[in-house]
From Swiss-Prot:
InterPro entries: GIY-YIG_endonuc, GIY-YIG_endonuc_sf, UPF0213_domain. It comes from the Bacteria. Residues 7-82 form the GIY-YIG domain. This is UPF0213 protein VIBHAR_05350. SMART domains: GIYc. Belongs to the UPF0213 family.
Amino acid sequence: MSDTAEQRWSVYLIRNNRNALYCGVTNDVERRFNQHQSGKGAKALKGKGPLVLEWSCAFENKSMAMKAEYFIKQLTKTKKELLVQESAVIQVGEGQSFVFYSRK
């Protein structure tokens, strides 16, 4: 098995100083967050610190993590805030699609 196949991939949400949530995918959340903080990450976060890692969720492989990232990016800010507050979850549904569930 290759190193890539054994890695856990995660989706994460980072809050910037404008209260916006940035969504990304990585195989090492701590390393990637440190890159964002040092200005070596996404252009969307440069100069918008302090940054706060608000949420992350691990997936079984890179493909699923990237699908989850796309799904989360399509959510409204309100729904992303529910994920951060742990008042909602996303789950893999039929056909490897994602479903948003509120915990109310």
